Amino acid sequence: MKPNNRTCDVITNKDESLPALLLPALNSYTCDDSLLKGQISSNGRYQPFGFSDCSLLPKRLNIQAGQGSMPVSSIQCADHSYSNWQKESEKTKLPKLGCPTEYTEYYKTVSSGETTDSAVVSSIATNRLKRKRQRDGPSCDSCRIKKIKCNATIIIFLQDRNLISSISSNLHYTLSQDDINQFRMKFFRKLPDVMGTYEVIKHLDKIVLFKACTSCSRRNQKNGKCLFSRGFTKSDMNVFPKINSKLKDKSIFEMTVDDYVAAGFQTL
């Protein structure tokens, strides 16, 4: 391209923080010769559009056509590159939530009873996460039907393959105090006195301390049963359905060790 009386029109931006826009004349260049862009920009003086050229501009640009021009050297362009932004962000240190920081105004000693701003935000975020997060294991039958959160307590006190064929022939069996005393030396030597708070249940190869969920306890104080017909844990859900597929019309509470072996599982 070859410059031919190159002129430009200065379009002022409404936002004064932004640089002005320079538009070249429509008939400023011809394609007779090839010229590097760097050579084109070497001419620093520009003249405004002539009246005939202004007629070719859009209506909004015609407003600025009569204004004087300005040299390119007077225009300052801000550096908005990513590398420059990254360098500036690295210089700024922000305190982490719930952690000590160099900014003393953001941090106080939690152990003294005072609460930090960052600790409060962290606590709120943690509580929201807990409310939204689903239960780790299966829910009881009632809560699963109602599609509500089940808060039943399931504590695995002991897991031993010998338990499958011990204590009772049933795979799911609620122990009495006499059963605990009978097998205390073998399985319950370290079991604390929890009979008033938890049910002690033999469940497949586990001894489980179980407490019914709030929903089932309120629904029926007399016969409130919090039932887990698919098992207490996710691993149980792989065992009982397989037994049930071969033994129809038999619930988890009626299955025996013989049913367990008939389904292809081994006791030891």
Curated annotation (Swiss-Prot):
One of its GO terms (biological process) is positive regulation of induction of conjugation with cellular fusion. Keywords: Nucleus, Transcription, Transcription regulation. One of its GO terms (molecular function) is sequence-specific DNA binding. It is found in: Nucleus. Gene3D superfamilies: Zn(2)-C6 fungal-type DNA-binding domain. Its main location: nucleus. Disruption phenotype: Leads to increased expression of NCE102 and PRR2, when SUT1 is also deleted. The keyword Zinc does not apply. The keyword Coiled coil does not apply. GO terms for cellular component: nucleus. It comes from the Eukaryota. Belongs to the SUT1 family. This is Sterol uptake protein 2. It comes from Saccharomyces cerevisiae (strain ATCC 204508 / S288c). The lineage of its organism: Eukaryota, Fungi, Dikarya, Ascomycota, Saccharomycotina.
